[in-house]
């Protein structure tokens, strides 16, 4: 098997580069110079891959590639939700979807972050997996990290994998306080407020998207931040998903009257709008409705997901 095949299904192997270049060139009518800027390749590389694609049979009248469906989904979702960036990972039976999403998100960040820029990170399994696969890049490019919410435990599976010399600002407070009054006091502490202001000034952010229909598999429930009773009550109020512990309905509107919202310590969802790029990482067909709501609410402007989930999203928005 060639090195190009081994690069992985999550990053940009040569076949995927050919497929993307062909799509942009023949379907979207972009020039080779525009494609080179979009993909971070030289114009000569774009030209050579177009030629190689023709010679190998990948590029014909149609794009003869396993990535074609992913590109079509990407194009449809980018246009429908006005996304800055999107990566749909090809279907791979029996693969660990969380691992694949984390690697895909790491590649997206490596393509967009510049040396010494600031990355804000939300809690959750997908974001922590991303950090694990981004650790070498973070060290080499001196990327600074800041957490978007309180709590040390939820972040340690990812941050604990980083080099000790990495610059990481962790909010010195729990993710959820025991009361609204205590949460208010903690938010006003200088040390907490400073980290929150730093997070708002980030160059990019990465967040997971929870779905209410995950039930006992929801990260926020498994981590002990809400009870099963609270989850049921929140679902009855019309919630379909959450980001950073804030629950929203199918239109992306924050659900009012939710106790946890007053007890969370960290950035509120509307504060994410100050960050130029906010990447949502989520997969699994049960999360499709929550992902749609997150995009409708404009909480994220970039997405990493898998082919089956993207297909489900398109099916739902076309109803």
UniProtKB/Swiss-Prot annotation:
The keyword Membrane does not apply. One of its GO terms (molecular function) is DNA binding. Residues 32-55 bind DNA. Keywords: Cytoplasm, DNA-binding, Repressor, Transcription, Transcription regulation. It is found in: Cytoplasm. Inactivated by phosphorylated autoinducer-2 (phospho-AI-2). Phospho-AI-2 acts by binding to LsrR, which is then unable to bind to the promoter regions, allowing the transcription of the target genes. GO terms for cellular component: cytoplasm. Belongs to the SorC transcriptional regulatory family. PANTHER family: TRANSCRIPTIONAL REGULATOR LSRR (PTHR34294:SF1), TRANSCRIPTIONAL REGULATOR-RELATED (PTHR34294). Transcriptional regulator that represses the expression of the lsr operon in the absence of the quorum-sensing signaling molecule autoinducer 2 (AI-2). It also represses the expression of the lsrRK operon. Acts by binding to the intergenic region between the lsr operon and lsrR. In the presence of phosphorylated autoinducer-2 (phospho-AI-2), LsrR is inactivated, leading to the transcription of the genes. This is Transcriptional regulator LsrR.
């Amino acid at each position: 098997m060639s090195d190009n095949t081994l690069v992985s299904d999550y990053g940009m192997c040569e076949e995927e580069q050919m497929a993307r270049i062909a799509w942009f060139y023949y379907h979207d009518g972009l020039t080779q110079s525009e494609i080179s800027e979009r993909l971070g390749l030289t114009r000569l590389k774009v030209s050579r891959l177009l030629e190689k694609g023709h010679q190998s049979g990948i590029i014909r009248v149609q794009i003869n590639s396993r990535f074609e469906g992913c590109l079509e989904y990407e194009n449809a979702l980018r246009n429908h939700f006005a996304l800055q960036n999107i990566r749909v990972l090809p279907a791979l039976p029996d693969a660990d979807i969380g691992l694949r999403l984390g690697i895909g998100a790491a590649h997206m960040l490596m393509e967009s972050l510049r040396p010494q820029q600031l990355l804000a990170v939300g809690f959750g399994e997908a974001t922590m997996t991303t950090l694990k696969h981004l650790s070498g890049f973070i060290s080499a490019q001196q990327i600074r990290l800041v957490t978007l919410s309180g709590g040390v435990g939820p972040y340690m599976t990812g941050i604990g994998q980083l080099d000790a010399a990495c610059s990481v600002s962790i909010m010195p407070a729990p993710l959820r306080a025991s009361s609204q009054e205590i949460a208010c006091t903690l938010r006003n502490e200088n040390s907490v407020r400073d980290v929150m202001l730093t997070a708002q000034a980030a160059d990019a952010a990465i967040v997971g998207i929870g779905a209410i229909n995950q039930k006992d598999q929801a990260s926020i429930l498994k981590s002990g931040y809400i009870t099963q009773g609270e989850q049921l009550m929140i679902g009855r109020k019309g919630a379909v998903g959450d980001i950073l512990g804030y629950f929203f309905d199918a239109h992306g509107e924050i659900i009012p009257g939710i106790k946890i919202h007053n007890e969370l310590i960290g950035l509120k969802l509307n504060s994410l709008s100050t960050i130029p790029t906010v990447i949502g990482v989520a997969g699994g067909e049960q999360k499709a409705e929550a992902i749609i709501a997150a995009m409708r609410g404009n909480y994220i402007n970039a997405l990493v997901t898998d082919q089956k989930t993207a297909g489900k999203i398109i099916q739902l928005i076309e109803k």
